[in-house]
Amino acid sequence: MSRFSFLSVPMLVVAAAVLPGISIAGWEVDPTHTHIGFQVSHLKLTKTPGIFKRFESTLVFDEQAIEKSSVKFVIDATSIDTAHEGRDKDLQGPDWFSAAAHPTITFASSKVRPAGGNKYWIDGDLTLRGKAIPVTFSAVLTNRTDHPWHKIPAVGIAATTTIKRSAFGMTQHLGAISDDVTLSVALERRSLEARVLATPVLPSPP
């Protein structure tokens, strides 16, 4: 059986399979290659992106007994960044995230299911503006490899889901701004245990 747990900042929102033949007693997030964000359509012309800069998470993943796996994450709603200061302030206000009354956005899984190969379904409740609604993330283990600069095992994970913002009470400018919002996670984790790689070490990190 392969089983591990994480408590980390920033967040982990999806499960990763165990790298073969190694111990995973400790893993850490690579914060420079980890992102949580969203996209929303503007006038059906472009998709406006945004990210959250502060988040926490816990994960338990059991490769041999998926039903024992679980995921939870907490996002600081005030850490939103859409590259527009005025818009960020509006999004924290009462028409949108209502961050003063509801400072966090949370997800707690109820089930992690295999979807074939390197893919998983993660079911759970997303709580936004104090309202919890069931959602399902589609997660992919993008790669597992030896990190060429740090000489340690690493995994990459991506996960997405689409929500209706109106379901959470965010009905401002429906039509001009799409009701559908895509939430996404790009994550890189690496082992805390250094080990010698069979592959050559590159001269310097990117």
Language-model regions, residue ranges each:
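Bacterial N-terminal signal peptides that target proteins for export
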Residues: M1-M11
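Low-complexity, acidic/polar, glycine-enriched regions of mature
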Residues: G21-P206
